[in-house]
Amino acid sequence: MKRNKVSKLQMRRLAAGVTIALLAGTCQVMADQSTNPISESEVFTADRLAQVVNKNNMPKERFKSVAAGILGYTHDKASIKTINIDMAGHDLTLDLTKVADLGTDYSAYGIKANNKTTIVVDSNKTNPGKNGTITIKAKTLWSPSGDSGSKYTAAHGIAVGNFSQRFNKKVSEDLVKTTINADVVIEELRGGSIKTTGISSMDCSDLAINGRFTIKPGAISLMQWNRGDQSKTYGIYMIGSNNTISITSADIDDSKHGSLSDLIKTDESLWGGKTEKNVLRIGGGTLKVKENQKERYLISAAKGFRTFINVNQDGSAIGISKADLQGTIRMDAGSEAYVGLTAGSKWVGGTQADIKGKVNLFLSEGGEWNTLNAGQGSRVTRF
């Protein structure tokens, strides 16, 4: 039988072709199985884990180092950066639990967007009927030595906002937009010794969660409470001006654990700027704090804040969802709350006795308002 001879050149070409094919296949597998944090647009082909396990992929920001599962950040003079993430029906886990092993220089964020950044996450862009879920968990380290900011770390589920706004730049240029078309679950957040929040917004931010936002009971905690007013835990936190948060529905039930300082909290600007135009909209769901706890509120709002729970966009009519609420509402002058109790809805609680702001309650047939709230008394501005 005659055998075909293969030249050395042909052999080299064949070997090179096989090597290229193998490398191409290997690269594809690595892309599918990547556990690196996300900082660019991406389409999933399988369930995705974004994990911080070392000090790579954590760029220095202006004030502290950041570890984030999804990070949107550009320098002040850069153009707006857009990150589009299509989960394509797969689940996304943002695991920042190993940040605690990196030392006291790092705070942890599931999703962090600031400085001219737009982030859009779609659960399934082409087939909305097949949806995935985003799960967030994070831990940071506390150090008993020193008093510098680097010694006191924080953990946040979702943090949005433009820190440059403190220098009074234009809102239109600085607005940080984050849209999440998926359900989000906060599984665990353990901060070092300063604010730990499920959601945090700071100046010129627009966050929309078009899905269900859940904080599991007892998920938020601190390792060490040692900085007075700065040692706080919040479900949703706002500070500064021009912040908008919209959530289709929420499930935050802290009625048994009592681990939250306040479920919803807003503060005035820390830098002497205006505190105004802050809006929170929640379509319905469960929002509960542990009753009979001194100075722990369902809502604790500084001036310039409006919140809408199960009401329409302008607060003129009741919504169509159910709301299960528990806790006291405290509002400073210049702030307003709009609460809608449809059939099957319930609010156990009331307002702080010396409330300065306004609470507008919509109570339809079948809704229930129970004011047995530790004797604090209630004053509803409009009923």
Could you tell me what each predicted segment is?
Residues 33-62, 66-326, 331-349, 355-368, ...:
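Surface-exposed loop/turn motifs in large extracellular/passenger domains
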Residues 27-32:
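Sec/Tat signal peptide C-region and signal peptidase I cleavage site
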Residues 17-25:
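Bacterial N-terminal signal peptides
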Residues 1-17:
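Bacterial Sec-dependent N-terminal signal peptides
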